[in-house]
Design a protein with these regions (language model features):
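Beta-rich carbohydrate-recognition and catalytic domains
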Residues: 1-28, 32, 36-93, 102-160, ...
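Electrostatic interaction modules used in gene-expression and signaling proteins
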Residues: 327-329
């Protein structure tokens, strides 16, 4: 399927949020937000706020809408800070890049985020019945897969997001499904250690995986949301704009064709040990996952839906970045919220061709 045949497109709207010049918590940018709705229907942004030294917190800001379009935000403070030991390293700390999925079956907002602690980036889970008070369920643990000979718990993991409704896993068990992106290179946390991908993995580049949590386990113990099993690859990098790695964006949404997943694709050179890369380019891609078997890709755009073309997307802490992380319906339209050059937050409209 070519990009012109792919049934969805993104149309750039503009910049939604910039760092406040005198706000120390935003000294190194606002970026990569989640979104959440309050009980009375108000829409909130949960931006990643980056202080000096690349220390990140998760903020809260109400989104202001004019004529059906998000145009501004009103800041309301911080909802999550790196306060746990596993969110802090000797020379680093952070809670980063949140994704939030409202799961009606649980009546909860489920947040995945990156805990940047002593072992590098690890995925963690938190839950909330509103937009302000988040209960940590802790870092994710991965059931060991002896067939692949891999313990995913050994590896850095980012870009995790829950599906909004249960699906049946490959064994037919009704489960909550999660997309995530493990990386096999351990040099950032163990210099000199070579990459050790799972046995038989045909492509070692960071790719999109899926894991599952049985619904009945969560009904017995909410903390099971952080215990994942049944891991398998969904998609590898394929096209020129994503030759280095790919990672999930907002929670997938149900469309006529299946599950629509927006994601980011990266091309360029990654320098080991560098948190804020300077020689890469991030773009927004899209694929359709099967409605019943979401580990199967039905179709995929062969070109990016949005690339770093404006000054706000090209110039920043990490240049040349479009990083979609949230998707919301406002009136008759859907809007995508994305990080711009690791410095600002932009908005694009999701259009049906």
């Amino acid at each position: 399927m070519t990009s012109t045949e792919f049934p969805y497109a993104l149309t750039r709207v503009g910049v939604l949020m910039c760092p406040e010049p005198d706000n120390d918590l935003e000294a190194e940018g606002v970026l990569n937000p989640a979104t959440v709705r309050s009980a009375d229907g108000r829409l909130y942004l949960l931006p990643r706020l980056v202080a000096a030294g690349n220390v990140s917190r998760i903020g809260l800001a109400e989104i202001k809408v004019a004529d059906g379009v998000p145009v501004d935000v009103a800041r309301e403070g911080v909802v999550l800070s790196p306060e746990r030991v596993w969110e802090q390293g000797a020379q680093n700390a952070g809670v980063e890049d949140p994704r939030v999925t409202f799961i009606p079956d649980l009546g909860l907002n489920v947040m995945t985020y990156v805990a940047y602690g002593p072992l590098g980036p690890r995925t963690a889970v938190a839950v909330s019945s509103d937009e302000r008070s988040w209960r940590r369920l802790g870092p994710v643990t991965f059931e060991y897969d002896d067939e692949a000979g891999v313990d995913l718990g050994l590896y850095p993991n980012k870009d995790a997001v829950f599906f909004p409704e249960p699906v049946r896993d490959p064994d037919g068990v009704l489960s909550f499904a999660i997309l995530h992106r493990p990386s096999w290179d351990l040099q950032d946390i163990r210099p000199g250690e070579t990459a050790r991908p799972p046995l038989g993995l045909p492509d070692p580049r960071p790719s999109i995986w899926i894991s599952f949590v049985p619904v009945d386990a969560v009904q017995k113990d909410l903390a099971a949301l952080a215990r994942w099993r049944g891991h398998r690859v969904v998609a590898w990098p394929e096209t020129p704009f994503e030759q280095t790695k790919i990672g999930s964006g907002p929670a997938p949404i149900r469309v006529d064709e299946g599950w629509l997943l927006l994601y980011h694709g990266v091309v360029g050179e990654l320098v080991p040990g560098v948190a804020q890369q300077q020689n890469v380019s991030y773009s927004a891609g899209a694929m359709i996952l099967d409605a019943e078997e979401p580990w199967k890709v039905v179709s995929r755009a062969t070109a990016p839906l949005l690339t770093a073309d404006t000054d706000d997307e090209r110039d920043g802490i990490v240049p040349n970045v479009v990083f979609p992380t949230a998707l919301e319906r406002i009136g008759d339209d859907r809007f995508v919220f994305y990080g711009m050059a690791d410095s600002k937050i932009g908005v694009a409209r999701l259009d049906v061709r």
